[in-house]
Protein backbone atom coordinates (compact mmCIF):
# COMPACT_ATOMS: atom_id res chain seq x y z
CA UNK A 1 0.00 0.00 0.00
CA UNK A 2 1.07 3.52 -0.73
CA UNK A 3 2.20 5.85 2.03
CA UNK A 4 4.43 8.83 2.48
CA UNK A 5 7.27 8.25 4.95
CA UNK A 6 6.12 10.00 8.09
CA UNK A 7 8.47 12.68 9.34
CA UNK A 8 5.85 15.16 10.50
CA UNK A 9 3.27 14.31 13.14
CA UNK A 10 0.26 15.53 11.16
CA UNK A 11 1.34 14.17 7.77
CA UNK A 12 -1.61 11.78 7.71
CA UNK A 13 -4.13 14.59 8.13
CA UNK A 14 -2.44 16.63 5.40
CA UNK A 15 -2.49 13.64 3.03
CA UNK A 16 -6.26 13.35 3.54
CA UNK A 17 -6.97 17.09 3.54
CA UNK A 18 -9.38 18.19 0.82
CA UNK A 19 -8.39 21.91 0.88
CA UNK A 20 -4.65 21.14 0.71
CA UNK A 21 -5.14 18.71 -2.18
CA UNK A 22 -7.26 21.33 -3.99
CA UNK A 23 -4.62 24.07 -3.60
CA UNK A 24 -1.86 21.76 -4.84
CA UNK A 25 -3.98 20.64 -7.79
CA UNK A 26 -4.69 24.27 -8.78
CA UNK A 27 -1.01 25.24 -8.68
CA UNK A 28 0.14 22.18 -10.63
CA UNK A 29 -2.67 22.61 -13.18
CA UNK A 30 -1.65 26.19 -13.98
CA UNK A 31 2.01 25.25 -14.28
CA UNK A 32 1.27 22.21 -16.44
CA UNK A 33 -0.98 24.08 -18.89
CA UNK A 34 1.47 26.94 -19.40
CA UNK A 35 4.46 24.58 -19.75
CA UNK A 36 2.71 22.30 -22.24
CA UNK A 37 1.65 25.30 -24.33
CA UNK A 38 5.29 26.38 -24.48
CA UNK A 39 6.45 22.90 -25.54
CA UNK A 40 3.91 22.36 -28.33
CA UNK A 41 4.57 25.88 -29.66
CA UNK A 42 8.30 25.21 -30.07
CA UNK A 43 9.24 25.78 -33.74
CA UNK A 44 8.89 22.60 -35.79
CA UNK A 45 7.77 20.42 -32.87
CA UNK A 46 5.47 17.60 -34.00
CA UNK A 47 6.26 14.54 -31.84
CA UNK A 48 3.48 14.80 -29.26
CA UNK A 49 3.67 11.18 -28.14
CA UNK A 50 7.40 11.52 -27.48
CA UNK A 51 6.70 14.56 -25.30
CA UNK A 52 4.10 12.58 -23.34
CA UNK A 53 6.51 9.64 -23.09
CA UNK A 54 9.14 11.97 -21.61
CA UNK A 55 6.62 13.25 -19.07
CA UNK A 56 5.58 9.75 -17.98
CA UNK A 57 9.21 8.60 -17.87
CA UNK A 58 10.20 11.50 -15.60
CA UNK A 59 7.25 10.75 -13.29
CA UNK A 60 8.13 7.06 -13.10
CA UNK A 61 11.82 7.75 -12.45
CA UNK A 62 10.97 10.29 -9.72
CA UNK A 63 8.82 7.69 -7.99
CA UNK A 64 11.59 5.09 -8.21
CA UNK A 65 14.06 7.54 -6.65
CA UNK A 66 11.60 8.40 -3.86
CA UNK A 67 11.05 4.71 -3.18
CA UNK A 68 14.80 4.07 -3.16
CA UNK A 69 15.26 6.64 -0.39
CA UNK A 70 12.23 5.41 1.51
CA UNK A 71 10.00 8.43 0.98
CA UNK A 72 7.33 6.64 -1.05
CA UNK A 73 5.85 3.18 -1.28
CA UNK A 74 3.70 1.80 -4.06
CA UNK A 75 2.57 -1.59 -5.23
CA UNK A 76 4.87 -3.31 -7.70
CA UNK A 77 3.33 -4.14 -11.06
CA UNK A 78 1.19 -7.27 -10.91
CA UNK A 79 -1.10 -8.88 -13.45
CA UNK A 80 -4.39 -8.30 -11.60
CA UNK A 81 -3.81 -4.59 -10.96
CA UNK A 82 -2.41 -4.07 -14.47
CA UNK A 83 -5.59 -5.53 -15.99
CA UNK A 84 -7.77 -3.36 -13.75
CA UNK A 85 -5.79 -0.18 -14.43
CA UNK A 86 -4.92 -0.56 -18.14
CA UNK A 87 -8.12 1.18 -19.37
CA UNK A 88 -7.24 4.16 -17.15
CA UNK A 89 -3.78 4.37 -18.73
CA UNK A 90 -5.26 4.37 -22.24
CA UNK A 91 -7.70 7.11 -21.25
CA UNK A 92 -4.87 9.12 -19.68
CA UNK A 93 -2.86 8.88 -22.90
CA UNK A 94 -5.83 9.97 -25.03
CA UNK A 95 -6.70 12.76 -22.58
CA UNK A 96 -3.22 14.29 -22.55
CA UNK A 97 -2.68 13.76 -26.30
CA UNK A 98 -5.95 15.48 -27.27
CA UNK A 99 -5.12 18.23 -24.78
CA UNK A 100 -1.72 18.77 -26.41
CA UNK A 101 -3.26 18.85 -29.90
CA UNK A 102 -5.89 21.37 -28.80
CA UNK A 103 -3.26 23.54 -27.09
CA UNK A 104 -1.17 23.46 -30.27
CA UNK A 105 -3.81 25.46 -32.14
CA UNK A 106 -5.89 27.10 -29.39
CA UNK A 107 -4.97 30.08 -27.22
CA UNK A 108 -4.73 29.13 -23.54
CA UNK A 109 -7.74 31.25 -22.43
CA UNK A 110 -10.01 29.70 -25.09
CA UNK A 111 -8.74 26.23 -24.20
CA UNK A 112 -9.49 26.71 -20.50
CA UNK A 113 -13.00 27.98 -21.21
CA UNK A 114 -13.86 24.93 -23.30
CA UNK A 115 -12.53 22.64 -20.56
CA UNK A 116 -15.59 23.71 -18.54
CA UNK A 117 -17.68 21.45 -20.78
CA UNK A 118 -15.96 18.50 -19.10
CA UNK A 119 -17.74 19.40 -15.85
CA UNK A 120 -21.14 18.88 -17.49
CA UNK A 121 -20.10 15.44 -18.74
CA UNK A 122 -18.70 14.48 -15.32
CA UNK A 123 -21.80 15.71 -13.46
CA UNK A 124 -24.19 13.70 -15.62
CA UNK A 125 -21.75 10.78 -15.59
CA UNK A 126 -21.91 10.76 -11.79
CA UNK A 127 -25.71 10.76 -11.97
CA UNK A 128 -25.55 7.79 -14.33
CA UNK A 129 -22.86 5.74 -12.55
CA UNK A 130 -23.14 6.79 -8.90
CA UNK A 131 -26.76 7.97 -8.55
CA UNK A 132 -27.94 11.43 -7.56
CA UNK A 133 -29.47 14.29 -9.50
CA UNK A 134 -28.72 17.65 -11.09
CA UNK A 135 -30.29 20.66 -9.33
CA UNK A 136 -31.74 23.69 -11.18
CA UNK A 137 -28.82 25.83 -9.98
CA UNK A 138 -26.33 23.31 -11.35
CA UNK A 139 -28.21 23.32 -14.64
CA UNK A 140 -28.00 27.13 -14.71
CA UNK A 141 -24.23 26.96 -14.23
CA UNK A 142 -24.03 24.45 -17.10
CA UNK A 143 -25.87 26.90 -19.36
CA UNK A 144 -23.33 29.59 -18.41
CA UNK A 145 -20.50 27.17 -19.22
CA UNK A 146 -21.90 26.51 -22.68
CA UNK A 147 -22.46 30.26 -23.18
CA UNK A 148 -18.86 31.04 -22.19
CA UNK A 149 -17.61 28.46 -24.71
CA UNK A 150 -19.75 29.97 -27.50
CA UNK A 151 -18.56 33.51 -26.67
CA UNK A 152 -14.95 32.28 -26.51
CA UNK A 153 -15.19 30.65 -29.94
CA UNK A 154 -16.70 33.83 -31.41
CA UNK A 155 -13.88 35.90 -29.91
CA UNK A 156 -11.32 33.44 -31.29
CA UNK A 157 -12.86 33.62 -34.77
CA UNK A 158 -12.99 37.42 -34.60
CA UNK A 159 -9.29 37.60 -33.74
CA UNK A 160 -8.41 35.06 -36.44
CA UNK A 161 -10.30 37.01 -39.12
CA UNK A 162 -8.37 40.15 -38.24
CA UNK A 163 -5.06 38.27 -38.44
CA UNK A 164 -5.99 36.21 -41.54
CA UNK A 165 -9.03 37.67 -43.34
CA UNK A 166 -9.22 34.86 -45.93
CA UNK A 167 -8.80 31.99 -43.48
CA UNK A 168 -11.65 29.56 -42.78
CA UNK A 169 -12.29 30.04 -39.07
CA UNK A 170 -15.33 28.19 -37.76
CA UNK A 171 -16.49 25.92 -35.00
CA UNK A 172 -15.69 23.06 -37.40
CA UNK A 173 -11.97 23.84 -37.28
CA UNK A 174 -9.71 20.93 -36.21
CA UNK A 175 -8.81 22.47 -32.85
CA UNK A 176 -12.45 22.31 -31.76
CA UNK A 177 -12.65 18.62 -32.66
CA UNK A 178 -9.56 18.00 -30.53
CA UNK A 179 -11.08 20.04 -27.71
CA UNK A 180 -14.38 18.13 -27.72
CA UNK A 181 -12.51 14.81 -27.83
CA UNK A 182 -10.43 16.00 -24.88
CA UNK A 183 -13.57 16.80 -22.87
CA UNK A 184 -14.95 13.30 -23.50
CA UNK A 185 -11.62 11.63 -22.62
CA UNK A 186 -11.17 13.79 -19.51
CA UNK A 187 -14.64 13.02 -18.17
CA UNK A 188 -14.23 9.30 -18.86
CA UNK A 189 -10.81 9.31 -17.18
CA UNK A 190 -12.07 10.98 -13.99
CA UNK A 191 -15.22 8.85 -13.66
CA UNK A 192 -13.59 5.51 -14.39
CA UNK A 193 -10.54 6.31 -12.25
CA UNK A 194 -12.83 7.00 -9.29
CA UNK A 195 -14.43 3.56 -9.67
CA UNK A 196 -11.07 1.83 -10.16
CA UNK A 197 -9.52 3.51 -7.11
CA UNK A 198 -12.31 2.05 -4.98
CA UNK A 199 -11.97 -1.34 -6.67
CA UNK A 200 -8.19 -1.59 -6.27
CA UNK A 201 -7.90 0.42 -3.02
CA UNK A 202 -5.07 2.39 -4.62
CA UNK A 203 -3.41 5.21 -2.71
CA UNK A 204 -1.88 8.34 -4.24
CA UNK A 205 1.53 6.89 -5.15
CA UNK A 206 -0.07 3.68 -6.47
CA UNK A 207 -2.28 5.76 -8.77
CA UNK A 208 0.65 7.89 -9.91
CA UNK A 209 2.95 4.92 -10.55
CA UNK A 210 0.42 2.83 -12.47
CA UNK A 211 -0.81 5.82 -14.51
CA UNK A 212 2.69 6.59 -15.77
CA UNK A 213 4.37 3.16 -15.87
CA UNK A 214 1.56 1.60 -17.92
CA UNK A 215 1.42 4.64 -20.21
CA UNK A 216 5.08 4.24 -21.29
CA UNK A 217 4.68 1.29 -23.74
CA UNK A 218 1.37 2.72 -25.00
CA UNK A 219 2.92 6.10 -25.81
CA UNK A 220 6.01 4.59 -27.41
CA UNK A 221 3.86 2.29 -29.56
CA UNK A 222 1.64 5.15 -30.75
CA UNK A 223 4.73 7.23 -31.48
CA UNK A 224 6.32 4.54 -33.69
CA UNK A 225 3.02 4.01 -35.51
CA UNK A 226 2.03 7.62 -36.15
CA UNK A 227 5.08 9.89 -35.88
CA UNK A 228 8.03 10.57 -38.15
CA UNK A 229 11.22 8.97 -36.75
CA UNK A 230 13.45 10.06 -39.63
CA UNK A 231 16.84 11.54 -38.71
CA UNK A 232 15.80 14.95 -40.05
CA UNK A 233 12.64 15.08 -37.95
CA UNK A 234 14.44 13.81 -34.86
CA UNK A 235 17.05 16.55 -35.24
CA UNK A 236 14.27 19.12 -35.59
CA UNK A 237 12.33 17.90 -32.54
CA UNK A 238 15.29 17.23 -30.26
CA UNK A 239 17.00 20.58 -30.45
CA UNK A 240 18.41 22.11 -27.28
CA UNK A 241 15.34 24.30 -26.80
CA UNK A 242 12.78 21.52 -27.24
CA UNK A 243 14.77 19.08 -25.06
CA UNK A 244 14.92 21.61 -22.23
CA UNK A 245 11.21 22.31 -22.62
CA UNK A 246 10.35 18.59 -22.54
CA UNK A 247 12.41 18.05 -19.38
CA UNK A 248 10.67 20.97 -17.66
CA UNK A 249 7.32 19.67 -18.91
CA UNK A 250 8.14 16.25 -17.50
CA UNK A 251 8.95 17.76 -14.12
CA UNK A 252 5.65 19.66 -14.02
CA UNK A 253 3.78 16.49 -14.98
CA UNK A 254 5.00 14.90 -11.74
CA UNK A 255 2.97 17.44 -9.79
CA UNK A 256 -0.22 17.19 -11.85
CA UNK A 257 -0.04 13.39 -11.92
CA UNK A 258 0.14 13.15 -8.14
CA UNK A 259 -2.27 16.00 -7.35
CA UNK A 260 -5.00 14.75 -9.72
CA UNK A 261 -5.24 11.37 -8.02
CA UNK A 262 -4.86 13.00 -4.59
CA UNK A 263 -7.69 15.48 -5.21
CA UNK A 264 -10.08 12.82 -6.57
CA UNK A 265 -9.36 10.53 -3.59
CA UNK A 266 -9.52 13.24 -0.89
CA UNK A 267 -12.67 14.89 -2.30
CA UNK A 268 -14.75 13.53 -5.20
CA UNK A 269 -14.64 13.51 -8.98
CA UNK A 270 -17.23 16.31 -9.14
CA UNK A 271 -15.32 18.45 -6.63
CA UNK A 272 -12.19 17.80 -8.69
CA UNK A 273 -13.93 19.09 -11.82
CA UNK A 274 -15.50 21.99 -9.89
CA UNK A 275 -12.07 23.12 -8.68
CA UNK A 276 -10.90 22.91 -12.26
CA UNK A 277 -13.70 25.30 -13.22
CA UNK A 278 -12.77 27.87 -10.58
CA UNK A 279 -9.15 27.47 -11.64
CA UNK A 280 -9.96 28.63 -15.17
CA UNK A 281 -9.61 32.35 -14.40
CA UNK A 282 -5.95 32.24 -13.22
CA UNK A 283 -5.04 29.81 -16.04
CA UNK A 284 -6.69 32.05 -18.64
CA UNK A 285 -4.96 35.13 -17.23
CA UNK A 286 -1.63 33.26 -17.32
CA UNK A 287 -2.29 32.53 -21.01
CA UNK A 288 -2.93 36.21 -21.68
CA UNK A 289 0.29 37.17 -19.89
CA UNK A 290 2.71 34.56 -21.27
CA UNK A 291 1.32 33.91 -24.77
CA UNK A 292 -0.05 35.87 -27.71
CA UNK A 293 -3.70 35.09 -26.95
CA UNK A 294 -6.56 37.12 -28.47
CA UNK A 295 -7.37 40.21 -26.42
CA UNK A 296 -10.76 41.40 -27.62
CA UNK A 297 -14.02 42.09 -25.82
CA UNK A 298 -15.55 38.67 -26.52
CA UNK A 299 -12.44 36.75 -25.42
CA UNK A 300 -12.15 38.67 -22.15
CA UNK A 301 -15.90 38.40 -21.53
CA UNK A 302 -15.83 34.62 -22.06
CA UNK A 303 -13.20 34.27 -19.33
CA UNK A 304 -15.38 36.01 -16.76
CA UNK A 305 -18.54 34.17 -17.87
CA UNK A 306 -16.60 30.93 -17.48
CA UNK A 307 -15.44 31.94 -14.02
CA UNK A 308 -19.00 32.93 -13.07
CA UNK A 309 -20.23 29.52 -14.20
CA UNK A 310 -17.59 27.81 -12.07
CA UNK A 311 -18.49 29.95 -9.07
CA UNK A 312 -22.19 29.23 -9.60
CA UNK A 313 -21.45 25.52 -9.81
CA UNK A 314 -19.38 25.64 -6.62
CA UNK A 315 -22.24 27.32 -4.72
CA UNK A 316 -24.73 24.82 -6.16
CA UNK A 317 -22.61 21.87 -5.03
CA UNK A 318 -22.20 23.37 -1.55
CA UNK A 319 -25.97 23.84 -1.17
CA UNK A 320 -26.54 20.31 -2.43
CA UNK A 321 -24.17 18.87 0.18
CA UNK A 322 -25.80 20.90 2.98
CA UNK A 323 -29.26 19.75 1.90
CA UNK A 324 -28.21 16.11 1.93
Curated annotation (Swiss-Prot):
Subcellular locations according to the entry: Golgi apparatus membrane; Cytoplasmic vesicle membrane; Endoplasmic reticulum membrane
Keyword Amino-acid biosynthesis included in the entry's annotation: no
Topology feature Lumenal, residues: 35-44, 98-116, 160-170, 226-243, 292-295
Coiled-coil ranges per UniProt: none
Record's bilayer topology term: Multi-pass membrane protein
This protein's record includes keyword Zinc-finger: no
Protein name, per record: GDP-mannose transporter
Similarity comment text for this entry: Belongs to the TPT transporter family. SLC35D subfamily.
Transmembrane spans: 14-34, 45-65, 77-97, 117-137, 139-159, 171-191, 205-225, 244-264, 271-291, 296-316
Assembly with partners or alone: Homooligomer.
GN (gene name): VRG4
Organism superkingdom: Eukaryota
A GO biological-process term: protein N-linked glycosylation
Amino acid sequence: MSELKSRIGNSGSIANSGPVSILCYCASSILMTVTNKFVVNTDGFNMFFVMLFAQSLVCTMCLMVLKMFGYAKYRPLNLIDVKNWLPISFLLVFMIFTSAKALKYMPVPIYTIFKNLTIILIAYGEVLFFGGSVTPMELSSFILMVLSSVVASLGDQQAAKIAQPLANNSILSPEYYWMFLNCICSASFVLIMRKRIKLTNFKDYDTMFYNNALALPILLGFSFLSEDWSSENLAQNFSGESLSAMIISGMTSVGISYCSGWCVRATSSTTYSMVGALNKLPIALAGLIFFDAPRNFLSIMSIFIGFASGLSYAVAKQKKVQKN
